[in-house]
């Protein structure tokens, strides 16, 4: 998979700016987890072992956008849990895209067809679908 030219330019510009400012350490990707809850219980994922108080917590749209603003990274990965479970995931993504953040929404895709209407096509948004190998191995790993 190639990287779109506009993304190369934006990220390259960000890296150059950090270098010119003399910064040796700076964020490149914000790992934003608006929730830990998932619609699967994969054996390899430690999230299922968290107490319900954590699994039931949801970041608000404003908390997510504030975190992105504070971090300043040009890229935001939204893993989970399963982000498509979040009731406001469409607004979270729209707010990040409006800030010209490159958003990678990581999903197991079980809800993707049902939730796809929440997302407006954008060169700043892509979906990363999690698979654990070919069908037989994947189905065993996530069941």
Residue ranges, per PLM feature:
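Conserved alpha-helical substructure of the radical SAM core
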Residues: 2-118, 122-123
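Conserved radical SAM core fold
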Residues: 83-85, 109-114, 129-143
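Broad gene-expression machinery/nucleic-acid interaction feature
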Residues: 126
């Amino acid at each position: 998979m190639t990287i779109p030219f506009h993304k190369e330019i934006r990220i390259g510009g960000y890296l150059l700016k950090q270098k010119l400012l003399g910064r040796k350490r700076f964020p490149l990707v914000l790992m934003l987890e608006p929730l830990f809850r998932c619609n699967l219980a994969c054996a390899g994922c430690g999230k299922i072992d968290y107490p319900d108080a954590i699994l039931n917590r949801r970041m608000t749209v404003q908390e997510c956008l504030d975190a992105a603003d504070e971090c300043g990274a040009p890229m935001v990965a939204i893993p989970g849990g399963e982000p498509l479970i979040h009731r406001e995931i469409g607004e979270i993504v729209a707010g990040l895209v409006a800030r010209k953040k490159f958003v990678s929404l990581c999903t197991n895709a079980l809800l993707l067809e049902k939730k796809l209407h929440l997302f407006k096509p954008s060169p700043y948004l892509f979906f990363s679908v999690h698979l654990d190998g070919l069908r037989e191995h994947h189905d065993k790993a996530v069941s």
